[in-house]
C-alpha cells in the first residue's frame, strides 16, 4: 500500500498544480473552488490512502458505497475528518441512506426527488440523525440529451421557485 500512497501523493500534487493554475488564470483565489476526489470503484483501504495523501473531500455515486466507505472509515479514528458528497442519479428508495451521510447531494433535477428528500429529512432531523436541512445542487441538463438527468434550462427558474418552498432542503448551487 506504500506504493499506492506515494502514487496518490504525487498525483494529488500534479492535480493541485493544474487546479491552482486554472484558478490563477481565471483571477480567482485558490479557495474559490474545491477539489473533490471521486472514490467510486475503490475500496476503503484505497480511500484511507487518499486521505493520508491529503484529500479531504470525497464523492460517491452509489448510496450503498457511501455508507460502506463511511462505516469502514469509522474504524480509522486516527484519520482526519473528511467530507462525502453524493453524486450521480439518486433514486427515492435510496434517500434514507444518503441523508445524514452526504453533506451535499449534487443531482437533484426534479421536484419529485426534492420533495422526497425534504419529507424524509424531517424524520432524520427529528431523530437527531441530520443537523438541519439537506444541502443540494440542482442538476441542469444543458446538453438536452434525454439519457441525461436534470431539469431543462428553460424550466430551471420554475424548479428553483418550487424547491425554495421546501423547508428541509437548501439549494447551494447548480450542477451541469
Task: Name each region found by the language model.
Residues 1-176:
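Conserved alpha/beta-domain cores
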